[in-house]
């Protein structure tokens, strides 16, 4: 037995080292291309910004490659940015294979069939029932996604030509304005239903108001306090990383942290003064306020009702960042006042929320298949692209082989963070939003509701947050939505 424990210790250490090394490889990832460095300088100049840094080494991190992918007018530059980022995940392929083996061993030691079954066991139902439930939810929202996909493809065909995007074919992955085609806000100018309506350019409003990163976080905090929730602790401002440090490499993927049992909450993100990051701030602060609400519960209950709740809370508040709210806080001149302008707002939301759903499901679908042995290491990439095509209707713009490891180009894979929470959060947040709008006394279309300033909505939300994980998640859902 002593031998077995020793062996387990060795493997635990190996697992931890693999995890750190994969995340480090991802965090330091850069792709070097003098052509793309020039493209990035050109994009910043076009946006009337001074180049944010010297790019004479020609190397670009993920954030800059993503900007080229979204903003360049050149098919080839977008393609190179897309391919370039996927060079950083190639070295992760072998470590990930070993990581999956060790993760499965650990799961089996505590009585689960594999690591995927362990992940699926955390939802107050059997792993099999959970998998079936997720598939049912996807089938319910799929018709809406299919319509959005069809409309978006037709607009992309107009821009890039039917020879490159034939009728009925999947959309090439580098054309949707996002490195993983997970949200499509980057193609909004191409798909805007009614051009010429008053601008909803919140990024411009942020920059016009000269809001810096800290000011944006203050604005997010102000939303929560308007609901009657406490201000963030002073330690939050002293210990958070809100801007990208100039003197060292960090993982820029935004995250929220709860670092003690004494309400030491923080965020870590490389904030840019953009609308996207304003929404991300609301999302991350949602985690922080959840941490704060349950920090006095016994340690075992210091968690969300399930991980989808944790991801959904900040997103629920972000649904209240309506044009009317943005006018109130001085980031928009005026709210849309006719049906056409309103449809533009809804299209923006669909590109963000509806477009995400299949991606939210497929990442864990791929990992469940890897952990269960249904997909062996010799088919990692092929199986990934089969799922992307099936769920998203998206295809790689160039042929991919098993020499690559494209799943590893998404942070949550090397970081071993389960992803189903984001799929669930995209469903839950609309249920939460509807319930809180009702509590706030809102009547009329839901997309026009902002709970900003409503103590009644805040009390309802806070009561649910304070439950933490002390009750099964259906009880927490009932507490907020009835």
Cite the ranges covered by each PLM segment.
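A well-structured
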Residues: 1-204, 435-436, 444, 450-458, ...
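Catalytic Zn2+-binding segment of zinc metalloproteases
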Residues: 285-300, 317-324
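Post-HExxH zinc-binding segment in Zn-dependent metallohydrolases
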Residues: 130, 134-144, 304-341, 345
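Short pre-active-site segment immediately N-terminal to the catalytic Zn-binding motif
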Residues: 207-212, 262-282
